[in-house]
Structure formats: C-alpha cells, structure tokens
Amino acid sequence: MGCVQSFRNFCDRPKNTNVRISLPAVCFVWQIAMIILFGVFIRYNEEADTHWVEYRKKENISSDIENDFYFRYPSFQDVHVMIFVGFGFLMTFLKRYSFGAVGFNFLIAAFGLQWALLMQGWFHSLDYTDGKIKIGIENLINADFCVAGCLIAYGAVLGKVSPVQLMVLTLFGITLFAVEEYIILNLIHARDAGGSMVIHTFGGYYGLSISWMLYRPNLEQSSNLQGSVYQSDVFAMIGTLFLWMFWPSFNSAITDHGDGQHRAAINTYLALASTVLTTVAISSLFQKHGKLDMVHIQNSTLAGGVAVGTAAEFMLMPYGSLIVGFCCGIISTLGYIYLTPFMEKYLKIQDTCGIHNLHAMPGLIGGIVGAITAAAATESVYGKEGLVNTFDFVGPFKNMVPTTQGGHQAAGLCVAICFGIGGGIMVGCILRLPIWCDPADDNCFNDEPYWELPEEEEIIPPILHYNNHMVNKDV
C-alpha cells in the first residue's frame, strides 16, 4: 500500500503545461524514426511501381483501369475526409477547445497513419522474399481505419490531456490495433468489413479505460468550460454530416469488388437513415417540452453506421439494416441521457464525447449482429459460391460452416474488448506519470495552455452538466 500511495503522490504533483521542449522533441524524433523505418521497410506494391507495365503483361491485365487504384480511390477519399474533417469537427463542440479538437486530431492522425502503415504492413503486407512491406491504395485505407481507433479513444479524454500524451496514446493504440486486428481477422478468421469490433469496440474501450485511469476527482473546477455554445455546436454538426454522408464508403471500402461492396453500402445507408428518426424520437420524448438535444443529433444519429459495420457485407437484408439502425438510435440516445452521468458518478469514467454511446455500445451490438447473421447464413440465401466468397471459406477454413463462423465472430468480439480494456489500462498507467505536461483540473477543456489564441475572447456563459452541450438543462 505504501508503494501505491507513493506512486499516486508522484503522479499528482503540480502540473506544468509547457510543451516547448517535449512536443518538438517527440515530433522530430518520431518523424525521423518514421523516415528511417520507411527507408528500410516500405516499398510500392506491384500496382504502384513502375514495373506495373511488366506485371500487367504477365498477368494478362488488359487495361490500366484494372489497377486497384481506380476501384479503391473514391472510397479512400471519403474515408480520409471522415478521419480529418469528420472526426475533427465532431469534437469541436467544446466552447474553448476547438483548436485542440481539430488541431490535435490532425496531429495524431498524421503520425498514426505512418505508424499504421508499418505495423499493419509487418502483419499483412510483408514480402518474405526481400523483407519489404509493399503498400498500395488498400494499405492507405487500412491505415486510416487504424487511426480511427485512436481518434475514437481521443474522444474519451478530449480536453484533459496534453498533445504529448496524445502522441503516446496513438503510438500504443496503433500497435495494439494492429495486433488485435491480425488476431481477429487472420487467426480467428472473423469478418469485420466496417470495423464494428476491430475499430469501434476496441477504440471505445481503449479510450474509456484510459479515461478511467486518468480520473480527475476535481474536474468540476473546469465545469464552466465543459459545454458548448451555439456556434460550436453548429461546427460539430458539420463533422456529423460529413461522417453520416461518407459512412457507407467507410463500411464498404475494403470489401471485395462486386456484390459485397454494393451490399455493404446499401446496408449502411439504410441503417443510418433509420437511426436518425429514432434518435430524434427518443431525444424529444425524454426532454421536457419535447425539445431536441443537439448532443443526441450530433452523435447518436451515427450509431447505426457503427453497428451495421460487421454485418455490412452479409445478407442482412434491407429491413434488417433498418432494424439495426432503429435499435441503435434508441440505445445510443438513452446512453447519453442516463449512462454517461452514471459512469462518471459511480464508475469514475469521465467520457467527454460520450464515445461509450456512439462507438463502444454500438460496436458491441454490431459484433453480436454479425455473429447472429453469420450463424444464420444458409446456402439457399447466399448460394454455394456466395457463401464461400462472403465468409472466405477457402484454404485452412474451407470446411467451416456458418454456425462455426458465428462462434468465430463472437470470439473476435471478445478479443476486441480484451485488447481495448487491457491495453487502455496499461497505457493509462503510463499516461498518469507527471512528465507529459497535461493541464491542471481547473484548466481542462481550454485551448489556452497549448495554443496561441486571438486577443478578443467571447464572454463565457454559465454552463451545463456532463457533456450534454446545453446551457440550461431541464430533463
């Protein structure tokens, strides 16, 4: 007990937010490390290399149009916008933390995608003949997916950590993501086209576990900044709309060409539409005088896209997608109303953006839906070849049957949860050390410690409880 108390006392020393040495050092050293590692390991794959002409002749490819770039790049554009614009602006709801929301999102995404190309490359794209990682357009999409898990985790600690801590969070988050992704997709052989398990469940519980480890008992000292103003909510809604519009591309980006990709886009499109209506209904129903809460519209309207991710390429059927979206809109909105304050009060989890309701819970639902849909698959619905193609029943898995695949899907979900919680606790212990220049409790949710701000400041109105973005909250 004495050692534990000594560690706590060491971690609770006075805060110093001056990152003039630590942030440049981390950025320079890690970027130089990326340059060296890329020089040693990373090369273009055959479709991006100048030897494409020879490869085309060898494989009897008739036209450059058959290069994977032309199939994947539109989806890559959409996913890239989601990562840098969608996630960034979604987190600008805090009245005095918009620079940090967009700027630090930009920073960790730019670093994370480089590290992700290496980590995922070592697991998936390593050419054992020459020891090089061969990258193409699909690797760029997967790197963005990898980064998404860390951006989700950032939402739980938004406004409470320093940029140096975020870089550390991203370094470990990308590493853990690459390992759990390899275990789930390659060893367990689960299917997860839209990343309900691999991205959202992992990222959600990774962030929540870190937030639990970094619990601040005196965070109410910054309560006047822990909310939104009219303009900041409008900017956050821009992020919502970008995410909502491009989510079908997110869930279908790396599925097989043809029917799988087509089906994934349709299922996501319908689930998202259904979620909007139930979110509005529940938000109005549970608010006094039936007024809508902007936090629900910004976040819960996206939950259907998260939940349909795993089963997006399965024969979920259009009505099934609507049902998934319908349920997620209800569960996510009720989570913001009841679960977020409960978790802060009783579980000591301070979830700034409510990622438990937007990512973690819908990710769990998505994993369960995927397991049930896979187990219920039949040859009469999919066709013999369609069943093999959809679930990749080839090679060592050629004798698998749908019921077994359902069990593998459930196992993949458990792995994602374990990696998220276990990894988050481990990284949270590291981030508790008083060497990262994080803000004091009375200086959270504020851009001032890390950004040069305009001289004229708006008058800050009195604010809110938890993260529900409202000045006067009557429930």
Swiss-Prot record:
Pfam families: Ammonium_transp. The chain crosses the membrane at residues 21-41, 74-94, 99-119, 139-159, 168-188, 194-214, 234-254, 266-286, 300-320, 322-342, 358-378, 411-431. Residues 1-20, 95-98, 160-167, 215-233, 287-299, 343-357, 432-475 are cytoplasmic. One of its GO terms (molecular function) is ammonium channel activity. Functions as an ammonia transporter. May play a role in the elimination of ammonia in the gill. It is a multi-pass membrane protein. Homotrimer. It is found in: Apical cell membrane. This is Ammonium transporter Rh type C. Keywords: Ammonia transport, Cell membrane, Glycoprotein, Membrane, Transmembrane, Transmembrane helix, Transport. Gene3D superfamilies: Ammonium transporter AmtB like domains. One of its GO terms (cellular component) is apical plasma membrane. It comes from Tetraodon nigroviridis. Glycans are attached at residue 60. One of its GO terms (biological process) is ammonium homeostasis. Belongs to the ammonium transporter (TC 2.A.49) family. Rh subfamily. Residues 42-73, 120-138, 189-193, 255-265, 321, 379-410 are extracellular.
